[in-house]
UniProtKB/Swiss-Prot annotation:
Location(s), subcellular: Nucleus
Keywords, ordered alphabetically: Activator, Nucleus, Transcription, Transcription regulation
Family, per entry: Belongs to the Mediator complex subunit 16 family.
Protein name: Mediator of RNA polymerase II transcription subunit 16
Record text on subunit structure and interactions: Component of the Mediator complex.
A Pfam family matched in the record: Med16_C
PANTHER family in alphabetical order: MEDIATOR OF RNA POLYMERASE II TRANSCRIPTION SUBUNIT 16, THYROID HORMONE RECEPTOR-ASSOCIATED PROTEIN-RELATED
Record's GO cellular component terms: mediator complex
Function: Component of the Mediator complex, a coactivator involved in the regulated transcription of nearly all RNA polymerase II-dependent genes. Mediator functions as a bridge to convey information from gene-specific regulatory proteins to the basal RNA polymerase II transcription machinery. Mediator is recruited to promoters by direct interactions with regulatory proteins and serves as a scaffold for the assembly of a functional preinitiation complex with RNA polymerase II and the general transcription factors.
Single GO biological process annotation from the record: positive regulation of DNA-templated transcription
Length: 955
């Protein structure tokens, strides 16, 4: 026998260069960092989602050491107006709750406000976004669960909320214009009868658990064992859960490589619960499990070739399947945005992956890295043996229950490792992410790859219209944004990377394709409409609009959004619908955000109009709710915090009305010399950019001004009949009354002025023959393009020559002229710019804030602190900042009183700004604040009962 050393292998080279061994091994392509660990995680346990993007816009991810959860979000940077990912904020309550156990899985609920965190021992803790995206409070502690390896979570799903939302099926081009197909989408159960949160989990030992909240916001739990055919089936590795019309569909994969399917029903006793009628000790709803159709199972195999297309189909070499392991299991539902309802049966999708490194002894290394196996869930007749026909039946016409079957569909092969399968864009797109960072969009029905060139006249999703993710090796964990315009990836070193979808917008090869450009705008519009209808955060869409679209394309998008939702901008008659219109603030918000440049630069004129209308709407709704919540006899008819907010908004509303009048008086003086030349008047008007003039001409903003006057009149009259007040409430209400009493114009005189403007606008429409069908056009021109349409030029002439002069005798013009309106932030003068640089105004309370240290450069802040003889911690003031408009709120805690909490919750301002953007707590600047150990935005305690009771209904 020859010695091993006789084959020419030098022992000195054994640990040297591999090429010197001359073993004939081909060099292997280096795999991404952490891929082997990622594949092992996916093989061993079904719940290993390390990063998740909620529908409210919060991105939560597990740190590299597996002991912490950090959160980030998209935000507009105040200094330069650029949209970026925020700095990370660690959630210390998660680390404390799990006591050093490795965190393995994250999952947001459907509204995107509550987060479930699971560790390696199957313990689950639950948290909720309280007042800001980076302020998350604990609801359920992980200590409630035992420390048991058999309790590891292999599948998890939140119960849906019971609410009907508006949705959109598609956009189709009809006669050169896009037509959008809206419909009302009903929710899919099961639901919690109290509309509280519920979380369904499947454990490794085959136990299904339901964690649910009682009406008092405390968590309870029930559990049951899934029916199995053998002991080995109880050791589960993966489970997929999804809500269907027939109950919860559960697919499990066991250690013996068997896939089973279950239908789980959750029955509540009692089925309904009304807190207004139930009196203690009436029982709260208690759930129980019922299992149906538990016999569907399939022995999994990965064929060497596509068995449905003949031998060696698609040119694939044959390979063995003994080394393929399941690394992913999902259930794909038909598209939810379907006006006819979801009629198709769901699909079960499994990922089978080959080992990352194989030896020469196994020829299967020539096979694909991943095989995606799909089964269609079908219902078929239950066939019996013919001998059963001879058995007499005791029941005539006995109906045989249908049988559920799993029908194998064509497999999908890939030479890359599939690391994630996500159903996005409301079920219209299946996104598969591979180990090299590439993302491929598929049609869930056919598994055909979207290429963006199939049909330029029909748009069902962004992917179908040609949006795609360029190749980028950025990570092994991925989560898509609420509207799939962006994705965030987590790499092997625990770093996050933001990725945006891209589109050519018709610019290809130096030419312009109008069809592709139009389809891209329609796809963005469709995504925005779906987000508005489902009450989903749309910052990812705004990010695409700001970064990728020209101002002309942005204007096209805004016009499409107003037409698609649809929004009739004419409110000369139906003004009451304006207060509760769900889409108007959404459109105004994104319109205002597109014109934001930075904190110190004025907005564009076109975006300043919707920004002002948003402020008018806030004051109008505030006054309406103030009177609503103070009706009838109550122990505390007026809350000091509410009155302080009413006081600030009253001062703002009055100053805004004075600012409008002051501007109109100046315009009347400028146009006085042109009273006899209508042509010159019209030409000068075209070159005039006056925000107050547009606000008065627009029926929407004019209606809000009338609502504000009605509210101010009611507050003024109610002071005399108000219940006896004490303390701060008396001081605030007295100041409100005194502010109205000393105003340079009476409320009734201002209402008379608005009536004169309304009359001038109506006469202009009537004179031009514009009826209700023609008026939305010029009204939209005012609101969207900030231009005075030709039909309203006579109205402007009447206002400046007749309405404004008639008001002079009823006002104190000197006081209005000398007023300081810089704090409104609406002018472009030097005084307003200086105020904007030095002070902030609470956007909710309309009260000037103290200069915040975090908003100043650190050197200047420290210098100011030294000059005042105070430490930095004494001058620092924590605040919330809107991630969209960059305005601030001084409230960093939930409202203290019930009335104040109900008011803020009804206004929708617990987590969101007046503009609709989400709040974020500003980070700490000084080391003295950081040395305390708790970062800014940390809610270390449990959510108070008052807060927990109202969070579910706010957004």
């Amino acid at each position: 026998m020859p010695l091993i050393m006789e084959d020419g292998i030098n022992v000195d080279d054994l640990f040297g260069e591999p090429g010197s061994l001359e073993l004939g091994l081909s060099p292997s392509t280096p795999s991404p960092r952490g891929l082997a660990q990622r594949l092992d995680e996916m093989r061993l346990i079904g719940c290993c989602q390390k990063i998740a993007w909620s529908k409210l816009g919060c991105i939560a991810y597990i740190s590299q050491d597996g002991l912490r959860v950090n959160v980030r979000h998209l935000q507009c940077r105040p200094s330069d107006g650029k949209w970026v990912l925020s700095e990370e904020t660690p959630l210390l309550p998660v680390t404390d709750a799990h006591g050093g156990h490795t965190l393995v899985h994250l999952c947001w609920n459907e509204p995107g406000a509550e987060l479930a965190v699971a560790d390696s021992s199957g313990r689950v803790s639950i948290y909720s976004i309280s007042i800001a995206l980076n302020s998350i409070a604990g609801h359920r502690q992980a200590a409630f669960d035992p420390d048991d390896d058999g309790a590891q979570i292999v599948g998890m799903m939140w119960l849906n909320t019971q609410r009907t939302v508006h949705s959109f099926y598609q956009a189709a081009k009809v006669q050169g214009r896009w037509a959008y197909s809206p419909f009302r989408r009903r929710p899919i159960g099961p639901f919690h009868p109290v509309n509280k949160a519920g979380l369904v989990c499947v454990t490794r030992s085959g136990i299904i658990r339901l964690l649910y909240q009682n009406p008092d916001s405390r968590w309870a739990e029930i559990s049951a064992e899934l029916k199995n055919t053998g002991y080995s089936d109880r050791l589960l590795t993966h489970a997929a859960l999804v809500s269907t019309q027939g109950g919860i569909l559960v697919a499990t994969h066991s250690a013996c490589q068997k896939i089973c399917l279950y239908r789980v029903h959750i029955a509540w006793t009692p089925t309904q619960y009304d807190p207004g009628q139930q009196k203690p000790p009436a029982p709260w709803p208690v759930p129980s499990f019922r299992f149906l159709h538990c016999k569907v199972e399939s022995q999994c195999d990965v064929p060497g070739t596509n068995r449905n297309a003949g031998d060696n189909a698609q040119g694939l070499p044959s390979f063995t399947n003994s080394f393929y392991c399941l690394t992913g299991l999902d259930i794909v539902l038909p598209a939810l945005d379907n006006p006819a309802g979801s009629t198709a049966n769901p699909w079960v999708v499994a990922i089978y992956s080959a080992p990352l490194h194989v030896t020469q002894d196994h020829p299967q290394q020539q096979g694909p890295a991943s095989v995606i196996v799909r089964w269609q869930l079908d219902t078929g007749p239950l066939t019996l043996h013919p001998k059963f026909d001879d058995v007499p039946s005791k029941k005539n016409n006995a109906q045989v229950k249908p049988k559920l079957e799993l029908r194998r569909l064509d497999d999908v092969y890939s030479d890359k490792y599939a690391i994630s399968i996500d159903q996005i864009e409301y079920g219209n797109v299946l996104a598969i992410t591979y180990d090299d960072g590439s993302v491929v969009f598929y049609d869930p029905k056919t598994m055909a790859v979207f290429n963006g060139v199939d049909d330029a006249n029909t748009v069902t999703s962004l992917a179908q219209a040609g949006f795609h993710h360029p190749p980028e090796p950025s990570g092994l964990h991925i989560s898509f944004s609420p509207n799939a315009c962006a994705a965030v990836m987590l790499d092997g070193e625990g770093q996050t990377h933001l990725r945006l979808t891209e589109h050519s917008y018709g610019a290809e090869g130096g030419l312009h394709d109008e069809n592709k450009y139009s389809a891209a705008i329609a796809a963005l519009t469709l995504a925005f409409c779906r987000g508005c209808g489902s009450d989903v955060n749309t910052d990812d869409i705004l990010l695409i609009l700001v970064r990728q679209l020209t101002p002309e394309a942005q204007a096209t998008f805004i016009n499409e959004a107003y037409r698609a939702l649809p929004i009739n901008c004419n409110f000369t008659v139906e003004q009451d619908k304006l207060m509760n219109h769900p889409y108007i603030p959404r459109c105004l918000s994104i319109q205002a955000a597109l014109g934001f440049k930075n904190k110190y630069t004025p907005r564009s004129f076109a975006s300043s109009i919707p920004w002002a209308v948003l402020q008018l709407r806030h004051a109008s709704v505030l006054y309406a709710f103030f009177f609503q919540y103070n009706k009838g006899g109550a122990t505390e008819p007026h809350d000091p915090d509410v009155l302080r907010m009413v006081l600030g908004n009253t001062k703002w509303a009055l100053d805004f009305s004075f600012y409008v009048l002051n501007e109109l008086f100046d315009l009347a003086d400028d146009f006085e010399s042109l009273s006899g030349d209508q042509e010159a008047f019209t030409q000068k008007l075209k070159s005039t950019s006056s925000l107050p003039l547009i606000i008065l001409l627009s029926s929407m903003s004019r209606a809000f001004l009338r609502f504000i006057c009605r509210g101010l009149r009611g507050i003024y009259a109610g002071y005399a009949t108000a219940a006896p007040l004490s303390g701060d409430a008396r001081v605030y209400y007295a100041e409100i009354y005194q502010t109205l009493e000393s105003a340079p114009i009476r409320i009734d005189a201002y209402e008379k002025f608005l009536a004169g403007v309304d009359s001038a606008v109506r006469h202009a429409y009537h004179g031009a023959g514009f009826g209700d069908a023609e008026r939305p056009g010029p009204e939209k021109e005012l609101l969207v393009n900030a231009r005075v349409p030709p039909v309203l030029v006579p109205a402007v002439s009447t206002i400046l020559r007749q309405t404004v002069p008639a008001l002079k005798t009823e006002i104190d013009r000197i006081t209005i002229y000398m007023g300081d309106y810089s704090w409104l932030g609406l002018s472009n003068d030097r005084r307003t710019e200086m105020y904007r640089r030095n002070r902030d105004v609470d956007i909710i309370k309309k009260i000037p804030c103290r200069p915040a240290a975090s908003a100043l450069p650190e050197t200047n802040a420290n210098a100011n602190a030294n000059q005042n003889g105070k430490s930095s911690t004494q001058v620092q003031q924590r605040r919330r900042r809107c991630v969209r408009c960059c305005e601030v709120s001084s409230d960093t805690h939930p409202p203290r009183s019930l009335l104040s909490f109900r008011m803020i919750a009804k206004l929708g301002l617990l987590r969101a700004c007046v503009c609709g953007g989400m709040w974020t707590l500003e980070p700490s600047v000084y080391s003295s604040a950081q040395s305390s150990g708790a970062p800014v935005g940390q809610a270390t305690g449990r959510t108070p009962a008052l807060m927990a009771a109202g969070l579910a209904g706010s957004s």
